[in-house]
Amino acid sequence: MELVQNNSIVIPPKSHIEQSYGPFYSSQDIYDEINIGSESTFTGSYTFAGVQSEKITINRGCNIAGFGVFSRGFCRNIEIHSDANIVGPYSFQYCSYLNSVQVHENCRISGNHTFSGCGIRELHLGRGIKVFGTGTFYQCENIEHLEIPDNAFFDSIFTFAKCVNLKSVRFGNNVILYGHSMFSSCESLEAVYFGDNVSIYGEDNFNGCPNLRIIEHGANFLNEDKTLRIFEKPYKRVRFEEIPEGVECSIRMESFDENSVIAQTTCGHYFNEDGLRNWVRQNDTCPMCRKKMKC
């Protein structure tokens, strides 16, 4: 079977690759892409380890089960399509030139240290992703901002530990985390935002994050990690139709509309949330009545 087409390595759909190492292992040739056809399975190890390729595409429903299949490669971009299953440990470990990773919806990553030590700068995770195992993105030092999508599920340890330049994490809605030390030693981390219906179990998930100052959460937030101390906001979001007619934001001196993000303080006043958030960071009283709002 001819696997090299137009300077790309192309694996046909529904292939089953059992061979370890093989002809492409640490090849000196430079390829445009490694394209794994949909519903293919890899059980061999280090099949494409050390290969120089601009991009790796893993198509829908693939199962990558071997050890280090793409590890130590020189690729810049990885795209993993929906319903793929990355089971094998060290699958992309030490791809130090890697710039962006896009994982589409409903993928499962369960191999230990799948992306550890990679040069990832842009990480896009799809809805419904499931992550298991140890150190999935351990020591990916170039990630600065991270978004965890809606309906994500994590049952893992040291998942993003030692991502030392990570500054902010924003969780979507309906996210469940069972973990230990998931974000430990992320020493640049400053802000974490949890969406609605987020649940956290385990402990030490944000241990060793000395610069973490902002922790905000939405409705129905459940925190069972006793090492993560949450300071409740002195206000809550409300819908436009819930506020009295004619009320204005006294910080920005403007009327609300259907597109406004409105916050109501514990003392009953209404403000634009961004303006109130900035106020609360510097003050401990309501901008309207000066009532003390937090300790």
Q: Which sequence ranges carry the predicted segments?
A:
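Structural signature of tandem-repeat unit edges
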Residues: 2-16, 28-42, 52-63, 73-86, ...
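Short, conserved catalytic or adaptor-binding loops enriched in Gly and charged residues
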Residues: 3, 25-28, 229-231, 255
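Eukaryote-specific detector of the first structured module of a protein
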Residues: 17, 22-25
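Consensus positions within tandem repeat domains that build extended binding/scaffold surfaces
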Residues: 45-47, 67-69, 89-91, 112-114, ...
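Short coil/turn segments at secondary-structure boundaries
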Residues: 47, 69, 91, 172, ...
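Disulfide-bonded cysteines in secreted/extracellular proteins and peptides
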Residues: 95-98, 115-118, 140, 163, ...
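C-terminal capping region of solenoid repeat domains
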Residues: 209-210, 214-234, 246, 268, ...
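RING-type zinc-finger domain of E3 ubiquitin ligases
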Residues: 242-295
